[in-house]
Amino acid sequence: MLELPGARACAGALAGALLLLLFVLVVRQLLRQRRPAGFPPGPPRLPFVGNICSLALSADLPHVYMRKQSRVYGEIFSLDLGGISTVVLNGYDVVKECLVHQSEIFADRPCLPLFMKMTKMGGLLNSRYGRGWIDHRRLAVNSFHYFGSGQKSFESKILEETWSLIDAIETYKGGPFDLKQLITNAVSNITNLILFGERFTYEDTDFQHMIELFSENVELAASAPVFLYNAFPWIGILPFGKHQRLFRNADVVYDFLSRLIEKAAVNRKPHLPHHFVDAYLDEMDQGQNDPLSTFSKENLIFSVGELIIAGTETTTNVLRWAILFMALYPNIQGQVHKEIDLIVGHNRRPSWEYKCKMPYTEAVLHEVLRFCNIVPLGIFHATSEDAVVRGYSIPKGTTVITNLYSVHFDEKYWKDPDMFYPERFLDSNGYFTKKEALIPFSLGRRHCLGEQLARMEMFLFFTSLLQQFHLHFPHELVPNLKPRLGMTLQPQPYLICAERR
């Protein structure tokens, strides 16, 4: 069969074009991986993938790996995440210096392909620093105050939910069970009251499925394949992989949230909001003639989803760790029981006003927050303009990781940080003392807007459960204490026995 000269020439030209394109891509990637002048030092990196492999193959969890690297390269060091120049901040002093003293510069979010794909850099948590974020944050803060922790009556709603949780636990009659789903349902219902003005029953399988997809995505987002997607977004064309599972989950959640929002808005009366969705729709109406307004149906869905996962995943895991440690350390549990019996008694419900009279219980919860590091690397920041920190030059648009684990295990501020020791939060007279270097809700302009509500939930759920139950592991079977890797650190699945006191 004869091959036409024109066909050979065409094939040759195509091959040459592909080689040229490959060469351009290689050069572009290598240029992206160059460390700028004055940039913080860091470990050696591989071509193209940078430090992704060393992170993924390390025997340590990422936050532990980063802390170890800081001992070699300093409290401020750099990583190359496949061409994404990243600065890691370690220790309380440098984190405070950046997030507080240079708060506006470090208040941005990185334009990572994952965030672009999931939320188009809209919504609330992952939006860029600017008017859109400021407007959404203002609305969320006001909503959490007016429809949540700012209302005295809202405490009674939390207590009602604690009793629904206690009733559900009692059905196991002291036998072993996994409390993850029950606590997740209870905690998420507090956020649901603020967002939608209603709670969901523990038998609502549709809502439970959505929360499970959220939780799965929190784990997937921290996986090596998703880091590779951020570095090389073209792998998104592959029909398989963890990134595709994450996107499928997100699509299901998006559709479900859209239906929830439509249902919540059925009885809406403009300018008389009863929950966050009402208030957001009012903002949409007011912004119809403002071309700069970022309030939209899409951003409403993104914001609601982010508030649900932020309000549920963190508080749920704090309580799961707290209960695990009560069973692990019966002497500590006994002291909490003693304080609850003394201050609250058996016949009264716990109340937020008792918190200041219960220093040991407060100390236990704060030690759980410190020791367990629910969000060890925070949410990634980015620089909104060029910055100089301790003599290092950090260009605009650099991804910044705040290693909160390194803060909470900083020997400068914590004696024997590897020990679970609630007494570190008590003074010589037994009074509770705050510690400056405890920042589980982060610092600066992007600190957690639901901190007050989260603290109220933790205290009321924890004291209510400990008032009613003695907690222990079945057959003294101690669970694996190594946390599951994700954007948050949650305990491995474990069984607990809750016997009526």
Swiss-Prot record:
Cellular component, GO, one term: endoplasmic reticulum membrane
Keywords carried by this UniProt record: Endoplasmic reticulum, Heme, Iron, Lipid metabolism, Membrane, Metal-binding, Microsome, Monooxygenase, Oxidoreductase
Tissues expressed in: Highly expressed in the liver and testis.
Classification via InterPro entries: Cyt_P450 (IPR001128), Cyt_P450_CS (IPR017972), Cyt_P450_E_grp-I (IPR002401), Cyt_P450_sf (IPR036396), Cytochrome_P450_fam2 (IPR050182)
Residues the record lists as binding substrate: A250
Cofactors: heme
Record membrane topology: Peripheral membrane protein
EC class name: oxidoreductase
Any one GO molecular function term: D3 vitamins binding
Subcellular location: Endoplasmic reticulum membrane; Microsome membrane
GO biological process, one term: vitamin D metabolic process
EC number: 1.14.14.24
Recorded metabolic or biological pathway in which this protein acts: Hormone biosynthesis; vitamin D biosynthesis
Deletion phenotype: Mutant mice are born at the expected Mendelian rate and have normal development. They display substantial reduction of serum calcidiol levels.
Main location: endoplasmic reticulum
Amino acids binding heme: C448
Catalyses which reaction(s): calciol + reduced [NADPH--hemoprotein reductase] + O2 = calcidiol + oxidized [NADPH--hemoprotein reductase] + H2O + H(+); vitamin D2 + reduced [NADPH--hemoprotein reductase] + O2 = 25-hydroxyvitamin D2 + oxidized [NADPH--hemoprotein reductase] + H2O + H(+); 1alpha-hydroxyvitamin D2 + reduced [NADPH--hemoprotein reductase] + O2 = 1alpha,25-dihydroxyvitamin D2 + oxidized [NADPH--hemoprotein reductase] + H2O + H(+); alfacalcidol + reduced [NADPH--hemoprotein reductase] + O2 = calcitriol + oxidized [NADPH--hemoprotein reductase] + H2O + H(+)
One protein family per Pfam: p450
Task of the protein: A cytochrome P450 monooxygenase involved in activation of vitamin D precursors. Can metabolize vitamin D analogs/prodrugs 1alpha-hydroxyvitamin D(2) (doxercalciferol) and 1alpha-hydroxyvitamin D(3) (alfacalcidol) forming 25-hydroxy derivatives. Mechanistically, uses molecular oxygen inserting one oxygen atom into a substrate, and reducing the second into a water molecule, with two electrons provided by NADPH via cytochrome P450 reductase (CPR; NADPH-ferrihemoprotein reductase).
Subunit structure: Homodimer.
Family: Belongs to the cytochrome P450 family.
The name this protein goes by in its record: Vitamin D 25-hydroxylase
Organism, as annotated: Mus musculus (Mouse)
Upper classification of the organism: Eukaryota, Metazoa, Chordata, Craniata, Vertebrata
Gene (UniProt): Cyp2r1
